[in-house]
Design a protein with these regions (language model features):
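Carbohydrate-active catalytic/glycan-binding domains of CAZyme proteins
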Residues: 1-175
Length: 175
């Protein structure tokens, strides 16, 4: 019910090696249920402790709270997506999207396990992307590029996920 929470289990334990092995971090976790497979797909930023080896990793599970199996890095055109700040969005038609800092919006494959195409590139964007859709309009939210420091948050709108995207300004008080 998103109000009463209880700990059930660690759903993706540290791996013995690889992108989530020892001396690596996994963060910014997002989970979507894939309509074509019925599986839950978890995405995360995986990196070394110095934040110099980023990957978007993914894991799958048949239940939302079961033990996920790390599948590896998410691939686009046969290469790992080496980014860090990301979000996800599932459209009303069931298509899944990976939202990346600095502008790329990647459309996921039907099974959500790889990137199919770059659906849009939002120029002059920021970090910590989040998207929602209301009354047929897409809204993309960002914060400025200041890492963990406080900053202003702004948004773009588009009538279609592929654009055109228009910067609208701040969505909360300045400062």
């Amino acid at each position: 019910d998103l109000v009463n929470w209880k700990f059930e289990r660690i759903v993706l334990p540290v791996q013995s090696d690889g992108i989530l092995g020892p001396d690596r971090v996994g963060e910014r976790v997002k989970v979507m249920k894939c309509p074509s497979t019925g599986e839950y797909v978890m995405y995360m930023h995986a990196d070394d402790l110095g934040y110099m080896d980023p990957y978007i990793g993914y894991a799958t599970c048949s239940t939302i709270n079961g033990e996920y199996k790390l599948q590896g890095p998410l691939l686009y055109e046969g290469k790992p997506v080496k980014r860090w700040d990301m979000g996800t969005f599932q459209d009303t038609d069931g298509k899944g999207y990976l939202l990346i800092h600095h502008g790329p919006v990647y459309r996921l494959s039907d099974d959500y396990c790889s990137v199919e195409a770059e659906a849009a590139y939002i120029k002059d964007s920021g970090e910590s992307p989040a998207m929602f859709k209301k009354n047929g309009m897409y809204y993309m939210l960002y914060s400025n590029l200041t890492s963990w420091e406080k900053n202003d948050n702004f948004y773009f709108t588009a009538p279609n996920i592929e654009g055109p995207w228009t910067k609208q300004g701040l969505f909360c008080p300045e400062g």
